[in-house]
């Protein structure tokens, strides 16, 4: 008997003993232990029956099929191809096709240890029915390998690896698709040592409720080369999911360049890492797009988990409560290279948020972070000892009702946001209560911004509102900004404010701050108990609005606050009833403001004030020269404008030369009342206007000291150079 006839007889006997019918020309293959079966091209098997297996290999058996093999099986719990014996091997040529119809069916599976199945190019596996698996490595030290252009379509699971130290390997341009609820397109479930790898151009699709594109259940690694695409659609769907385990196992997923991950549906996430100490790595040009309420682009919730992204990452999220980047595991970290973009649309959304102790999100240079929506926040740290860091040249934008660019909102003591040099931070916001573009609401938390920042805060509504570009509202909070800051506020009423006790805001040299189109504005405000403002040299503060303050240090019921300016400060207010510099504190310790050399104080409008100090122990100190100008000759400041006033035990002191020019009717150059004190080492005081007084006092004990070589002049009908009563010198 020839070998060919012998094999045909063996196969025929095997077929007759099985509980199914074979209708095709070619018989099923059931290779016995230690046998070798080889068939040529275009081999076709059609089977019907529950529990059927079209191609099987027992222990140490080897089966080889040529090109364009076709297997069709109709039946529940059936197998298209199965290694059911150890050390067995099944190999297909190019163009293999496997179609399974029935529930709990498996297209290809290694069921015995040390067994292997291999396909050439263009293999296709299609399964119809629930709880099915396209390719399953269900044994240890085993593998299933596909050449280029493999395609698997299933309802429940396209590929799974459940055996330890096993592999599933896909060549270039693989396409894997699932369509059922709770489906896993790629599933790595082994406890240790296993992997699933994809060459360039892999496409992973999953469409169903709670479906997952790539699921690492326990440990091991899934890796993709360049240009991978993952798309999931359905509520609670995840593009990539690394599940947390409590047995210490660690998982990893890696992508080459050009990966694109999409997740669409309620509570859908693009990348979701819960596994502790696990890693997700991405090359350059990664794109993550999610949509749906509560959706998140990148989420790392596992303690010690780590995400690494190359350059040019783009993350987009849309939907209420959506987030771009989220670090929620203690000690977790997410790092981006240069040119990252995060674009978020939705109410109560976040661009990037840290919500766990010691967690970090780090963006490289040239990052673009944009949020749009009511109560949206571009960058938010809401955990102690946590950090968001952004490199140079960042562009950060927040738009919408109460939208914020930077928010430090931590329960502990040392949350932090760091922004590099040359940043542009923009807010285009409406508000229904007090809103702040950059805010520290964390005890002892810190926001640091480098040199040459441009901050633009624009009110888009129509009502008068309260809102500051910079705000420290909690005790001990701090904002530190480098040299060359340019701050433009349009419609809101605050430039920078410190409300928290012991809080601090500091600027380097060359601060340029302006506020327009508002009233009751405060350029720089220090209101917290023992709070402190520090401003370097050459600062310019320009406020255009009535009832406003250029610099306001003090608040009712608080004291001990202070402000210090370097040399060449210029404070300008334009608007009726406004004050250029005002310090008021009434609880004993007083407030203190100090200016370096050659300060300029300018106030324009009716009933304006240049410098005003009030309250016991309150001091405004000009260390070397000051120029105070109220009104102009062509546009005078009438109706009781003042150059310098001290009241209620406060002191204004000028070392060097004080030049004070007052233009306006019924106005005053100097006034000290109610035990207030003004001390000028040398002065040139000129008051121009009807009923104007250069130096004015009353009977309540105010004191004015003007040193030698001073000049006091008054011009106008009823004008007086000096009107001194009790207490004046």
What are these regions (language model features)?
Residues 25-33, 53-59, 79-86, 106-113, ...:
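Glycine-rich beta-solenoid repeat tracts in large extracellular/virion proteins
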């Amino acid at each position: 008997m020839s070998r060919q006839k012998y094999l045909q007889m063996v196969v025929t006997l095997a077929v007759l003993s099985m509980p199914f019918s074979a209708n095709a020309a070619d018989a099923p293959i059931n290779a016995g232990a230690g046998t070798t079966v080889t068939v040529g091209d275009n081999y076709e098997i059609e089977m019907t029956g529950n529990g059927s297996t079209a191609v099987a290999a027992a222990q140490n058996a080897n089966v080889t099929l040529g090109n364009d093999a076709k297997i069709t099986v109709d039946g529940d719990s059936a197998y298209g191809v199965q290694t059911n014996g150890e050390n067995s091997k099944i190999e297909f040529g190019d163009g293999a096709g496997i179609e399974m119809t029935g529930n709990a069916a498996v297209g290809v599976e290694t069921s015995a240890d040390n067994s292997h199945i291999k396909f050439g190019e263009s293999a296709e596996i299609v399964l119809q029915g629930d709880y099915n698996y396209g390719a399953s490595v269900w044994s240890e030290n085993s593998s299933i390998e596909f050449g280029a252009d493999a395609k698997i379509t299933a309802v429940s699971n396209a590929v799974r690896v459940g055996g330890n130290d096993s592999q599933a390997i896909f060549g270039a341009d693989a396409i894997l698709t699932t369509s059922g609820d709770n489906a896993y397109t790629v599933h790595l479930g082994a406890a240790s040592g296993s992997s699933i790898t994809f060459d360039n151009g892999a496409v992973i699709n999953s469409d169903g409720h709670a479906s997952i594109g790539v699921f690492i259940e326990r440990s091991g690694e899934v890796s993709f080369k360049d240009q991978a695409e993952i798309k999931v659609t359905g509520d609670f769907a995840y593009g990539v999911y690394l599940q947390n385990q409590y047995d210490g196992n660690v998982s990893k997923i890696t992508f080459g360049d050009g990966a694109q991950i999409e997740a669409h549906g309620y509570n859908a996430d693009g990348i979701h890492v819960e596994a502790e100490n696990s890693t997700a790595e991405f090359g350059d040009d990664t794109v993550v797009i999610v949509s749906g309420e509560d959706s998140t682009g990148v989420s790392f919730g596992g303690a010690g988990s780590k995400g690494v992204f190359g350059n040019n990452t783009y993350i987009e999220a849309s939907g209420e409560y959506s987030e771009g980047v989220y670090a929620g595991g203690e000690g977790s970290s997410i790092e981006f290279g240069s040119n990252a973009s995060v674009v978020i649309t939705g109410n109560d959304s976040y661009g990037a948020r840290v919500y766990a102790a010691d967690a970090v999100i780090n963006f490289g240079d040239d990052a673009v972070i944009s949020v749009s929506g009511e109560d949206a926040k571009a960058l938010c740290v809401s955990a102690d000892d946590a950090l968001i860091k952004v490199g140079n040249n960042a562009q950060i934008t927040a738009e919408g009702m109460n939208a914020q660019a930077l928010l430090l909102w931590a329960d502990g003591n040392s949350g932090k946001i760091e922004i590099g040099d040359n940043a542009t931070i923009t807010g285009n916001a409406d508000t229904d209560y007090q809103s702040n573009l950059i805010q520290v609401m964390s005890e002892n938390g810190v926001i640091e911004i480098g040199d040459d920042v441009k901050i633009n805060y624009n009110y888009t509504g129509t009502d008068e509102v309260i809102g500051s570009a910079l705000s420290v509202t909690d005790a001990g909070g701090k904002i530190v900004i480098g040299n060359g800051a340019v701050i433009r506020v349009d419609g809101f009423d605050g430039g920078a404010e410190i409300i928290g006790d012991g809080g601090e805001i500091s600027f380097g040299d060359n601060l340029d701050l302006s506020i327009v189109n508002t009233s009751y504005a405060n350029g720089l405000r220090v209101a917290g108990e023992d709070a402190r403002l520090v401003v370097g040299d050459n600062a310019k503060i320009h406020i255009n609005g009535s009832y406003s303050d250029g610099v306001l240090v003090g608040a009712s019921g608080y004291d001990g606050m202070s402000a210090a300016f370097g040399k060449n400060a210029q404070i300008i207010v334009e608007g009726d009833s406004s004050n250029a510099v005002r310090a008021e504190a009434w609880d004993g310790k007083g407030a203190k403001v100090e200016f370096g050399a050659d300060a300029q104080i300018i106030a324009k409008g009716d009933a304006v004030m240049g410098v005003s100090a009030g309250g016991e122990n309150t001091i405004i100190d000009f260390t070397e020269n000051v120029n105070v100008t109220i009104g102009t000759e062509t546009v005078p400041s009438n109706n009781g404008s003042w150059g310098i006033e001290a009241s209620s035990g406060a002191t204004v002191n000028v070392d060097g030369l004080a030049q004070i020019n007052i233009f306006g009717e019924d106005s005053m150059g100097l006034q000290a009342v109610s035990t207030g004190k003004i001390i000028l080492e040398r002065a040139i005081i000129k008051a121009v206007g009807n009923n104007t007084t250069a130096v004015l006092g009353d009977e309540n004990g105010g004191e004015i000291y003007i040193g030698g070589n001073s000049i006091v002049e008054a011009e106008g009908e009823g004008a007086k150079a000096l009107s001194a009563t009790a207490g004046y010198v």
